[in-house]
Amino acid sequence: MKHIHLLLLAFLALFAGAPFRAAAEESFRDKVVLIPVGEDALTSKQSFGFMNRILERAQKEQARAVVFEMNTPGGLAWETSEMMMKSIQPLTIPTYAYVNPKAMSAGALISAACDKIYMAPVSSIGAAGIITSSG
C-alpha cells in the first residue's frame, strides 16, 4: 500500500516538479493542475463553476495534466454529471483522481470520469447513488 502512495508522489514530481495549486494566476502551461475536492466542494454551484473554469483554463493553456485530490462525501448530482460530460470528458489533457481518503457518491462519479484513479492506503470510493431530501 505504501508503494502506491509513493508511486503517485513520484508521478507528480516527475511531471510537475511540485504540485501546482489551481488558484494561482500564472500560466498552467506544462504544469500539473491540482484541484482539491474537499468535504464541501461538491455541495455548492459556485464550487462547480470554479472547477469548470479551472478545467477550461487548463485545456486552453495546455496544462500537462489535471489531478483531482478527492476527500469528499459527495454532493450535487446534476452539477456533477454536467461537469463530467461537459468539462472533464472533452479534455485532451490527462486527468487523474487521487482518492485521499474518500470519494463517495458524486466524488466517485468525478473519479470515474478521469483517465486514471489512484488511491491512498486505507481510502474508499463508491456509494454513487441519488439521495432525495427525504432520505
Residue ranges and their predicted role:
Residues M1-H5:
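Positively charged n-region of N-terminal signal peptides that target proteins for export
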Residues F20-G135:
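Soluble extramembrane regions of membrane proteins in the secretory/endomembrane system
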Residues L7-G17:
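Bacterial N-terminal signal peptides
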